[in-house]
């Protein structure tokens, strides 16, 4: 609770200082701890949830059933989406949880999701940075390269009857080492 409140204070101060009038929504990443007593404590702070695997969705559904997670809370579904994870995300959407937002890592996930849902939903796009990889391969699990986002939006999402773009999820695989690097990557994406 202390860390959540501290993060909320820092964002509130930064938003006020920069005359930014949108809202800040803290999302607790369930992979940081699945223990019920930690989730229950976190949820006392008016937060939202971020999932990263099929394992997380039944936990989220239980929190909703217990009344601990509001029906209008955001559930950001990150991570590689295949099989059971897509089915579980679709179940949340199809049973009327309106703020379930799958964060798409690749175009195939849009196809899999749309086959599983029976109503329109909002999605996010996970933006991969152009960082120097520490490995010799690139996987789509790391997100969609910034230069591919606008073409993907125009070609697949813009007129799609089942999905609407809600957010861009900026992702740096190695974490943010310094603010200059972060702002450089963000500016490249925005251009």
Where are these regions (language model features)?
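Active-site-proximal beta-alpha core segment in soluble small-molecule metabolic enzymes
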Residues: 24-190
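Low-complexity, highly charged intrinsically disordered N-terminal segments
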Residues: 1-19
